[in-house]
Curated annotation (Swiss-Prot):
A family per Pfam: Flu_PB1
Gene it is expressed from: PB1
Catalytic activity: RNA(n) + a ribonucleoside 5'-triphosphate = RNA(n+1) + diphosphate
UniProt keyword annotation of Nucleotide-binding present: yes
Primary residence: host cell
InterPro entries: RNA-dir_pol_NSvirus (IPR007099), RNA_pol_PB1_influenza (IPR001407)
GO molecular function, one term: RNA-directed RNA polymerase activity
Domain (RdRp catalytic) ranges: 286-483
Enzyme category, top tier: transferase
Protein name as it appears in the record: RNA-directed RNA polymerase catalytic subunit
Organism: Influenza A virus (strain A/Leningrad/134/1957 H2N2)
Protein location: Host nucleus; Host cytoplasm
Keyword Nucleotidyltransferase annotated: yes
GO cellular component: host cell cytoplasm; host cell nucleus
């Protein structure tokens, strides 16, 4: 029977059909090779947008710097970064006038956060530029290395464990004449193996001390490492993203804390909330504009796009904003917050690995590191690369490029949102002083603008005024990529609005399926994704039931765990059949052990082990939940785990799911090949650091309201916490006197060992 597809849509409102337009089925594109070319593009573009600015030279590092602030007023529609300081300050003043006390209150909240933030805040985050090794490392390791170097150079304020004290060390480190660091290196030598009598390569790992003078240290402290952004859909070209080092991160964190606090109080800001909360906030603004545009007014909405938002923003402008926002605050607070923008005004971008060359016959390959780009003969490069390198040469210092203007991706999302909202705020009638007025939504570089006016000319005039006002603060609305609709239909941050936000369920499609962590986690993540989509994305009961059946089928094929009574033959079917026959209560077997599926859309919130526990044979329970089972290396048992879920569009989301640890929660063993390289020392440091952090977390779980306060080392904090907890447990009768005495003895021993050390 042929089905006419148009019949499917007869009863469906147009906006619900959005899920059928899903374009992203395959894998997203990933980048290979070096990001050097993309980084050069970014640097060259950024300088081009600000080319009429003033050139100066940084006295400390010798880096040439371009300052476009208060540059020429725009005469055409080309994107430009010439923000006018007085315009930005005025926009801030009007924002404060419309929201009395907003800056004052946010400053107070931020001061409180600064007093309480621990340095371990910086261990969050993935790859971080590690200035001691001059390459990327996991955040925790990069922080540990930085602190280790600081301490060996006599900077010890960080020992209090407060982030603000670590930042004091950072500032002090910049005044030092030299910094001594330890680097890892690797020696190879050929030796004869005693057993086999063959020649083998023996590798030894050494550490050597290296002194960095003030200039080189400053360059490293101001360096952002660059990488290529992966998995970006809908783009022909890749682009570069930056990862800052530990010196900059803490300062950025405090600035963003202040900006986040301001954004929370602004109804036009799409940050820092997300999901349904964001939709509700945005729907309010739209409702306000539609209600106010009575029958006499027209209302249009622009789905906006800005040209190269980051590359036209300027850290000097952010400094002006912060100076204004904190103007009545204590000196120390203003200083702490102004350091991030000052560092960004003097930032250096690391060019990455450099270029790879292959000979015509493909026999020879050689890598030209970024450091060599200053001196190498350009005849080896093609036309476009040659142009790039020529442009960038005057800015090069030791493989890093001076990049004063521009912001790099994702650095000051909240603060730049405040700037955007301040322009939206100027659309009120009391500021436009005419018949048109505007409002809108802003989330980082994405915006939607709603303009109301009595007639079409008024709408046009309103849009023009908005466009010009943006230009004055370095925001370039793209006339080519923005489009206008009657209010009621627009798109903002991949949310589609049509008389209300439309659930675009197809965007979540890539996150359905089997994650491939292990049998236990995969089952849990799979059903949680379905549950979450029923809550958030209008996934209806019939579709959810179908999704569930498809998921179970997929899961069984992935882990070859078809039901014990099935006819399908796989490598596991012999064992699973045997288990099926021995089991009295077959409903109690987990799906991954060949059991039946007991999930339906009503019980998706219950972990499978809990769902089937009462139905299990006793000996099966004993095998399943046995921490001593020698075949399973267990994860730490946490009640909640986090999975990274990839929607089709936008950033990877973190999703919580229930984790019941069983013998199915195995972790694959780590690849051994890393152990023979110079990374080995780093890896061991990392594991030790990880263990310490885990231990510390056990003493001070993040849910605990008793955070370690005051100046003490991690060990002292843990010992004192152990003593307090032991006393409480002893007095309430949870532990015996002997146990209490033993704990106290261990604590004293630890303190004694520390003293001897």
């Amino acid at each position: 029977m042929d089905v006419n597809p148009t019949l499917l849509f007869l009863k469906v409102p147009a906006q619900n059909a959005i899920s059928t337009t899903f374009p992203y089925t395959g894998d997203p594109p990933y980048s290979h090779g070096t990001g050097t070319g993309y980084t050069m593009d970014t640097v060259n573009r950024t300088h081009q947008y600000s080319e009429k600015g003033k050139w100066t030279t940084n006295t400390e590092t010798g880096a040439p710097q371009l300052n476009p602030i208060d540059g020429p007023l725009p005469e055409d529609n080309e994107p430009s970064g010439y923000a006018q300081t007085d315009c930005v300050l005025e926009a801030m003043a009007f924002l404060e006038e419309s929201h009395p006390g907003i800056f004052e209150n946010s400053c107070l909240e931020t001061m409180e956060v600064i007093q309480q933030t621990r340095v371990d805040k910086l261990t969050q985050g993935r790859q971080t530029y590690d200035w001691t090794l001059n390459r990327n490392q996991p955040a925790a390791t990069a922080l540990a290395n930085t602190i280790e170097v600081f301490r060996s150079n006599g900077l010890t304020a960080n020992e209090s464990g407060r982030l603000i004290d670590f930042l004091k060390d950072v500032i002090e480190s910049m005044d030092k004449e030299e910094m001594e660091i330890t680097t890892h290196f690797q020696r190879k030598r050929r030796v004869r193996d005693n057993m086999t009598k063959k020649m083998v390569t023996q590798r030894t790992i050494g550490k050597k001390k290296q002194r960095l003078n003030k200039r080189i240290y400053l360059i490293r402290a101001l360096t952002l490492n660059t990488m290529t952004k992966d998995a970006e859909r809908g783009k022909l070209k890749r682009r570069a993203i930056a990862t800052p080092g530990m010196q900059i991160r803490g300062f950025v964190y405090f600035v963003e804390t202040l900006a986040r606090s301001i954004c929370e109080k602004l109804e036009q800001s799409g940050l820092p909330v997300g999901g349904n909360e964001k939709k509700a906030k945005l729907a309010n603004v739209v409702r306000k504009m539609m209600t106010n545009s009575q029958d006499t007014e027209l209302s249009f909405t622009i789905t906006g796009d800005n040209t190269k938002w980051n590359e036209n923003q300027n850290p000097r402008m952010f400094l002006a904003m912060i100076t204004y926002i904190t103007r009545n605050q204590p000196e120390w607070f203003r200083n702490v917050l102004s350091i991030a923008p000052i560092m960004f005004s003097n930032k250096m971008a690391r060019l990455g690995k450099g270029y790879m060359f292959k000979s015509k016959s493909m026999k020879l390959r050689t890598q030209i590191p970024a450091e060599m780009l200053t001196s190498i003969d350009l005849k080896y490069f093609n036309e476009s690369t040659r142009k790039k390198i020529e442009k960038i040469r005057p800015l090069l210092i030791d493989g890093t490029v001076s990049l004063s203007p521009g912001m790099m991706m994702g650095m000051f999302n909240m603060l730049s949102t405040v700037l955007g909202v301040s322009i939206l705020n100027l659309g009120q009638k009391k500021y436009t002083k005419t018949t048109y007025w505007w409002d809108g939504l802003q989330s980082s570089d994405d915006f939607a603008l709603i303009v109301n006016a009595p007639n079409h000319e008024g709408i046009q005039a309103g849009v023009d005024r908005f466009y010009r006002t943006c230009k004055l603060v370095g925001i370039n609305m793209s006339k080519k990529k923005s489009y206008t609709n009657r209010t009621g239909t627009f798109e903002f941050t991949s949310f589609f609005y049509r008389y209300g936000f439309v659930a675009n369920f197809s965007m979540e499609l890539p996150s359905f399926g089997v994650s491939g962590i292990n049998e236990s986690d995969d089952m849990s993540i799979g059903v949680t994704v379905i549950k979450n989509n029923m809550i958030n994305n209008d996934l209806g009961p019939a579709t959810a039931q179908m999704a569930l059946q498809l998921f179970i089928k997929d899961y069984r094929y992935t882990y070859r765990c078809h039901r014990g009574d099935t006819q399908i033959q796989t490598r596991r079917s012999f064992e699973l059949k045997k288990l099926w026959e021995q089991t009295r209560s077959k409903a109690g077997l987990l799906v991954s052990d060949g059991g039946p599926n007991l999930y339906n859309i009503r019980n998706l919130h219950i972990p499978e082990v809990c769902l089937k526990w009462e139905l299990m044979d006793e000996d099966y329970q004993g095998r399943l939940c046995n921490p001593l089972n020698p075949f399973v290396s267990h994860k730490e048992i946490e009640s909640v785990n986090n999975a990274v879920v990839m929607p089709a569009h936008g950033p990877a989301k973190s999703m919580e799911y229930d984790a019941v640890a069983t013998t199915h929660s195995w972790i694959p063993k780590r690849n051994r090949s890393i152990l023979n390289t110079s990374q080995r020392g780093i890896l061991e440091d990392q594991q030790m650091y990880q263990k310490c952090c885990n231990l510390f977390e056990k003493f001070f779980p993040s849910s605990s309201y008793r955070r370690p306060v005051g100046i003490s080392s991690m060990v002292e904090a843990m010992v004192s916490r152990a003593r307090i907890d032991a006393r409480i447990d002893f007095e309430s009768g949870r532990i015996k006197k002997e146990e209490f005495a033993e704990i106290m003895k261990i604590c004293s021993t630890i303190e004694e060992l520390r003293r001897q050390k």
